[in-house]
């Protein structure tokens, strides 16, 4: 997927925030990966390259690290809005 410069900037900010939140919780990349049932290389890639809401891992990281998907200013297309609504519904019912 080719990202606009604005979306690329948002994805990179997300990666920086993931790293800061993970380190703030005292977790290693491997530790966070175990919690999320994924590979540490996926966490490392998310921190280095960032992610967009098209990735399931984007929302899993938001859930685990207390990040808000809306804070990253991604283009508000219908798919994105539906994913945000789904995430909101899930987090409100599970907490």
Q: Which residue ranges define each predicted feature?
A:
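A short, Lys/Arg-rich alpha-helix, primarily the initiator
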Residues: 1-24
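Short, charged recognition helix plus adjacent turn
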Residues: 3, 71-95
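Short basic helix-loop element that most often maps to the first helix and adjoining turn
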Residues: 16-35, 60, 85-94
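Conserved hydrophobic/aromatic packing and binding residues within compact polymer-binding modules
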Residues: 18, 32-33, 43-46, 72
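Recognition helix of helix-turn-helix/homeodomain-like DNA-binding domains
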Residues: 36-53
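Short Asp/Glu-rich motifs
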Residues: 41, 52, 65, 81-83
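Short, basic-rich loop-to-helix N-cap that marks the start of a DNA-contacting helix
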Residues: 49-63
